[in-house]
């Protein structure tokens, strides 16, 4: 449902050139390629293993309109202009938003739009960013509009944190049910005790996210969508 909502709010249409910044394991890039077969979808990730996974999934699904570029976003330069640029949970890991938005503005076609999905906090003290997103941040709702130039926010939406709280609870339950297999997968690359420690850390992370995003009916920590 969130993938479809992302496409709707981004104003994606078949035949567009779509660039996803920080595509992760390809959920949105693959979904967009499947649902908009006349579009060209380019994902950017700093992980070669993510690129291999996405391209493998594309082959299995018979999708020939997906490309993945492995690059650090601080050094990335887009291959041409795009009708839509989409970023889902990447801006939290970037520091100089003004410079990033300036660069993105140069990657958009004349009628192009940027869609940003980002975690945010009601307050601007970044408490959660300091304690749970080391190296990243938890911006306040008005940060992006303040630094958007040369772009400007056309429309914005708030998704209550309760949705992400339920997602975190589901991830936690899934990890509990598959803890043995997950630990085995990590054992080898990691010593056995470190593998178990990593599983416990993920359990704590999911529980923390569920509690924090569910706090105060999801009004304190939440998700924001912006179209620029």
Predicted regions and their residues:
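Conserved SAM-binding strand-loop segment of SAM-dependent methyltransferases
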Residues: 61-73
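Conserved SAM-binding loop of SAM-dependent methyltransferases across substrates and taxa
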Residues: 27-37
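A short glycine-rich, Lys/Arg-flanked "PGG" loop and its adjoining helix->strand segment in the class I
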Residues: 98-113
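Conserved class I S-adenosyl-L-methionine
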Residues: 15-24
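A short acidic, Gly/Pro-enriched loop at the edge of an enzyme's catalytic core
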Residues: 74-85
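Conserved SAM-binding loop
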Residues: 54-55
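Conserved alpha-helix/loop element of class I SAM-dependent methyltransferases that forms part
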Residues: 1-16
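Substrate-binding/catalytic lobe of Class I Rossmann-like enzymes that use SAM or dcSAM, i.e.
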Residues: 120-223
């Amino acid at each position: 449902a969130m993938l479809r909502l992302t496409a709707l709010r981004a104003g994606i249409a078949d035949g567009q050139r779509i660039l996803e910044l920080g595509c992760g394991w390809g959920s949105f890039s693959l979904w967009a390629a499947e649902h908009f077969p006349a579009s060209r979808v380019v994902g950017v990730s700093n992980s070669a293993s993510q690129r291999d996974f996405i391209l493998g999934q594309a082959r299995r699904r018979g999708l020939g309109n997906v490309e993945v570029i492995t690059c650090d976003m601080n050094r990335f330069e887009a291959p041409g202009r795009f009708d839509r640029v989409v970023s889902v949970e990447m801006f939290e890991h970037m520091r100089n938003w003004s410079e990033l938005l300036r660069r993105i503005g140069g990657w958009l076609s004349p009628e192009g739009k940027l869609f940003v999905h980002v975690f945010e906090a009601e307050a601007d003290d970044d408490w959660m960013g300091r304690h749970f997103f080391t190296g990243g941040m938890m911006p306040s709702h008005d940060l992006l509009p303040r630094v958007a130039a040369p772009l400007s926010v056309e429309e914005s939406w708030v998704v209550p944190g309760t949705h992400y709280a339920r997602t975190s609870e589901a991830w936690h339950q899934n990890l509990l049910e598959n803890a043995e297999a997950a630990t085995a997968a990590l054992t080898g690359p990691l010593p056995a005790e470190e593998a178990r420690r990593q599983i416990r850390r993920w359990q704590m992370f999911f529980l923390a996210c569920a509690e924090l995003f569910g706090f105060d009916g999801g009004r304190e920590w939440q998700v924001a969508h912006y179209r620029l």
